[in-house]
């Protein structure tokens, strides 16, 4: 399937892997794909930029810890102190949800009669996720409505073709 991805879409997936490594996560999930997509050119004009999303994901992490009575600052300090200096950890697997997003990106491209899967198709696939998904919650947290983002993405794709 990756042979159908544009250069920029492949870059977004590579950036998602990098985001998982940076965050110290053991698997690549939907929020990593969202961060990867937001790091590519062209989607910033739609309000999709990485720094606000990273801050929102950090807030979601902190809220989850606080919900079970853990002080997030103590966890952050412990993690920073114990994090190894080695950057690459080898293969990081994709979660089923992240794989489903990539499959949905293919379906989005087919539905729009596009020959290749671009960053926009991955972003469109992310807008189809459940409201409980961390990627959707991150979008909501920066006041980006997934349905409105979807309309803007489709409009941009139609304008480009």
Model-identified regions with their sequence ranges:
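Histone-fold recognition with a strong bias for associated Lys/Arg-rich disordered tails
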Residues: 1-161
């Amino acid at each position: 399937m990756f042979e159908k991805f544009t250069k920029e879409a492949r870059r977004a997936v590579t950036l998602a892997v990098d985001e998982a490594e940076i965050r110290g996560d053991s698997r690549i999930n939907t929020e990593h794909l969202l961060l990867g997509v937001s790091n590519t050119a062209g989607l910033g004009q739609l309000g999709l930029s990485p720094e606000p999303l990273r801050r929102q994901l950090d807030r979601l992490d902190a809220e989850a810890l606080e919900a079970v009575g853990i002080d997030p600052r103590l966890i952050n300090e412990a993690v920073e102190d114990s994090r190894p200096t080695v950057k690459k950890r080898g293969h990081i697997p994709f979660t089923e949800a992240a794989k489903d997003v990539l499959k949905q990106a293919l379906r989005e491209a087919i539905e729009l009669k596009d020959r290749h899967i671009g960053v926009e198709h991955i972003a469109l696939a992310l807008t189809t996720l459940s409201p409980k998904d961390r990627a959707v919650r991150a979008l909501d947290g920066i006041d980006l409505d997934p349905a409105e983002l979807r309309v803007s993405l489709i409009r941009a794709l139609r304008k480009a073709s």
